[in-house]
Amino acid sequence: VLLALSMPTPALAPLGWVALGPLCVAVARTARRPAPRGPRPFLLGLVTGLVMFAGTVSWTSDVLAIFGGLNAALAWLLAGLLIGYLAVYPALFSLALTAALVRGGTPALVLAPDIWVGTEWLRGTLFTGFPWVLLGYSQSDTLAPLQAASVVGIYGLSGLVALPSAAIALLVTPDRGRQRARVVLAAACLAVVGVAVVWGSARVRSGALLAGPTSRVALVQGNVPQGQKWDPAHRDAILERYTHLTAEAARRGVDLVVWPESSTPFVWNRDAEYAEIMRARLVSAGVPVVFGSDEVVGPSEFYNAAFVMDAQGEIRGSYRKMHLVPFGEYIPVRWLLFFADSLVEGFSDFSAGQRLTLLPVGSHRLSVAVCY
């Protein structure tokens, strides 16, 4: 529950620092039991994972129902299967931590952050990866600790956030003869967190994040209901909404406007009429725009792409999404999961981009992150 609550929405970020504590304590107590321990360590992690992911990714059932055209029962079944699969990784964490505790005693709890990061990396890599709901994301709105990500990345940030949970487990789990070691290790965990937060706070206050030339950027969110997005009856209204908001932002003197992923209600390079209408309106606004749109190349390549258009209406660069969403944008191991074609028909034919691309905007170069 703490893991789910710490994530963006409801974003109770402080809970992230202690969210693994209850699981670590439960696993430590289980590891102290005489063998055989049975399936208890695995089940502890599995239940933790089920609650965690049910609270964070159950909304995918709506995506399957709206875009996949599935009935509610089947959509919930598939979302449940996804949640069950993701829950296996906290279960693996519990098994690995139990093994470490059996060999090294309670002080081995100091390894909990490393083991957790290992299972996150595994989850983000296997079967093309599912890198959502990483523990480090709980601090996405907390600037001081977030600075550590510039040095150690998201997985390192997850490990940092897990350290206080390890410290709590070290302090509350009894182990005769090893009290001094437990206290020293817990203090070391908290000291690492303290150093990272102090350094991050100093970095934020120093203005290092604002060093160099700056630009004013407007983010345009059309808030288009998903049921209307690809409905031809709403195409004109959607385009009007985005271009109107862009013109409004331009009047406020911004240097760049950014639209969301797949924001155009048409395929950019296949619908010349709407592309020209959009181009003319953006030229009138007089500001560069980064926008998301589908792109078709040849008879079989279909990309989720981002484009940058300069103030004169010329496309100056594009980026094709490289890490696609399984079952949303493509079907992994299609030869084995051929039966899934009908579940995601029309939404799984995207091709993966092959290279990283920086988009030029004036003297700046932009890196575009597309969902997932």
Label each region the model flagged.
Residues 202-372:
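Soluble catalytic domains of enzymes that build or remodel membrane lipids, polysaccharides, and related
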